[in-house]
Amino acid sequence: LLGRLRASTGAVVDLRHDVVVGRAPAATPRPGRPSPELLIITDADKSASKVHCAVRVEDWDLAVEDLGSSNGTFLLRPGRAPRRLAPHSPEPLAVGDVISLADAATLTVEDADE
C-alpha cells in the first residue's frame, strides 16, 4: 500500500494499483497488471470527463496522468503554482499533492498511515 487517494466527494481509495477517475471511468488493465480501480466522480456540470485521469502505481512510485480530458487535470503541489498536466504524460506524485479535475473535484494523496 503506497498511500490513499481522498476525493473531495468523500470517497477514499487505497493505492495498491492503478486508479482511473472520471464521471464514467472505464479501463483495460496494462499488460501484467491487475485491473485498475474505478473512482466515479459525480459531476452534474460535466466539467470532469467520463474518463478523466489515472493515478498510476509503478513499483514504489505514484504518478498522475491526464487521459485526454476536455477541461484538464491540474497538479497542486504545496509551495508551487498550480500546473495543468499535458495529456498522456505521467507526472510523479508525492504525499500532500492535490489533483484537481477541472472544477469537478479534488483528489489528495495521503500517506497510508493517515
Task: Tell where the protein language model's regions lie, with residue ranges.
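Intrinsically disordered, low-complexity acidic Ser/Thr-rich regulatory segments
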Residues: L1-A44, A105-T108, A112-E114
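A short, compositionally biased
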Residues: L1-G3, S69-S70, A94-V95
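Short polybasic amphipathic segments
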Residues: L2-R6, T73-L75, I99
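A generic structural motif
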Residues: G10, D18, D59-W60, S69-S70, ...
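Short hydrophobic/aromatic patches on the structural cores and recognition surfaces of FHA
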Residues: V21, V51-V55, D61-E65, N71-L75, ...
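C-terminal boundary/linker segments immediately following FHA domains
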Residues: V57, L76-E114
